Curated annotation (Swiss-Prot):
This is Gap junction alpha-5 protein. InterPro entries: Connexin, Connexin40, Connexin_C, Connexin_CCC, Connexin_CS, Connexin_N, Connexin_N_sf, Cx40_C. It comes from the Eukaryota. A connexon is composed of a hexamer of connexins. The keyword Iron-sulfur does not apply. Residues 2-19, 98-169, 232-369 are cytoplasmic. SUPFAM superfamilies: Connexin43 (SSF118220). Pfam families: Connexin (PF00029), Connexin40_C (PF16791). The gene is GJA5. SMART domains: CNX, Connexin_CCC. Keywords: Cell junction, Cell membrane, Gap junction, Membrane, Transmembrane, Transmembrane helix. Mostly in heart, and in the whole embryo, liver, stomach, and pectoral muscle. Residues 347-369 are annotated as: Disordered. One of its GO terms (molecular function) is gap junction channel activity involved in atrial cardiac muscle cell-AV node cell electrical coupling.
């Protein structure tokens, strides 16, 4: 029957990159077709022509009757059926291997470009850890839960291969029925030149051959059913994915409060600068903002005191103002806190200059009586 190892190796590679139904179909092809055909069908049909006997002595009549009864041997017909049915899967395997190689080359180029960029930037750690980009086996499918997801042109090639092998199965089943029918007859009447009259011819082991023919027809029908089931499986799976994608809510419709939550957490993770605590420390040991309401209240008090001094100066004159004493304000622990007002500031009648009218701090040229 020949060596089937070459075809078997290719079909093993196809088995790695097939769906669940496709793996069952390949198992049926291996066990119930190739194995049975190679072990049982060969010896059964080996003596077919030699045991085909006709009751005539006319030279050549027996040969032309056998040619009319069996235009092609059953075994050779089934071998052609296996080859034609397996060819679409082999084409798909070639496309898959080509896609894998192209993906490997693309990944290799990206790794080499990244290595060159890191080398130019002078990253010694990257040069020590990743000196050369290694070639790794990549896959064009994502495995989630043990299932293989086909995409893009690879999915189209896989679907076309299933359609072609389904058409081949139907064609060979119909062709076998047209050539031989369903069962072999024990007696075959031949009317063909150079036979001078109708000749009776006899087929060897017709019952055993009929059992084998029925078995091969059943396997062909099973393979056809598996191909249709695989098409339905792929179609239902893709339709389900599209429906789930259509009913899936878009990110724009999500509540905004959920989006702002991570931003608050990110803001809390930022650390302040080193000198930030000095501006927040107050004499009482509490943390206040440098622009708090207390500081604004002190500034308003200073402005009110300045206006009060002006009003008292207009009423009483400049005499009492020269008798007042001015005391320096104590140092403030915080650099950002507002200085405290002196106790005698509210009784002071000294006229302020235009430059110092807006400020309450003591100057170096102020008089002290």
């Amino acid at each position: 029957m020949g060596d089937w190892s070459f075809l078997g190796e290719f079909l093993e590679e196809v088995h790695k990159h097939s769906t669940v139904v496709g793996k069952v179909w390949l198992t049926v092809l291996f066990i119930f077709r190739m194995l049975v055909l190679g072990t049982a069908a060969g010896p059964l049909w080996g003596d077919e022509q030699s045991d085909f006997m006709c009751d005539t002595q006319q030279p050549g009549c027996e040969n032309v009757c056998y040619d009319k009864a069996f235009p092609i041997s059953h075994v050779r017909f089934w071998v052609l059926q296996i080859i034609f049915v397996s060819t679409p899967s082999l084409v798909y395997m070639g496309h898959a291997m080509h896609t894998v190689r192209m993906e490997e080359k693309r990944k290799m180029k990206e790794a080499e470009r990244e290595a060159q960029e890191m080398k130019n930037s002078g990253d010694t750690y990257y040069q020590q850890k990743c000196p050369v980009a290694e070639k790794t086996e990549l896959s064009c499918w994502d495995e989630s839960g043990g299932k293989i997801i086909l995409r893009g042109s690879l999915l189209n090639t896989y679907v076309y291969s299933i359609l072609i092998r389904t058409a081949m199965e139907i064609a060979f089943i119909v062709g076998q029925y047209i050539l031989y029918g369903i069962f072999l007859e024990t007696l075959y009447i031949c009317q063909r030149a150079p036979c001078p009259h109708p000749v009776n011819c006899y087929v060897s082991r017709p019952t055993e051959k009929n059992v084998f023919i029925i078995f091969m027809l059943a396997v062909a029908v099973l393979s056809l059913f598996l191909s249709l089931a695989e098409l339905y499986h792929l179609g239902w799976k893709k339709a389900k994915e599209r429906c789930s994608r259509a009913y899936k809510p878009s990110p724009s419709t999500a509540p905004r409060r959920l989006e702002s939550a991570p931003q608050v957490e990110r803001a809390q993770m930022y650390t302040p600068p080193p000198d930030f605590n000095q501006c927040l420390a107050s004499p009482n040991g509490k943390f206040i903002s440098p622009f708090s309401n207390k500081m604004a209240s002190q500034q308003n008090t200073a402005n009110f005191a300045t206006e009060r001094v002006h009003s008292q100066e207009d009423a009483a004159g400049e005499g009492p103002f020269m008798k007042s004493s001015y005391m320096e304000s104590p140092e403030v622990a915080s650099e950002c806190a507002a200085p405290a007002l002196p106790e005698s500031y509210f009784n002071e009648k000294r006229r302020f200059s235009k430059a110092s009218r807006a400020s309450s701090k003591a100057r170096s040229d102020d008089l002290s009586v």
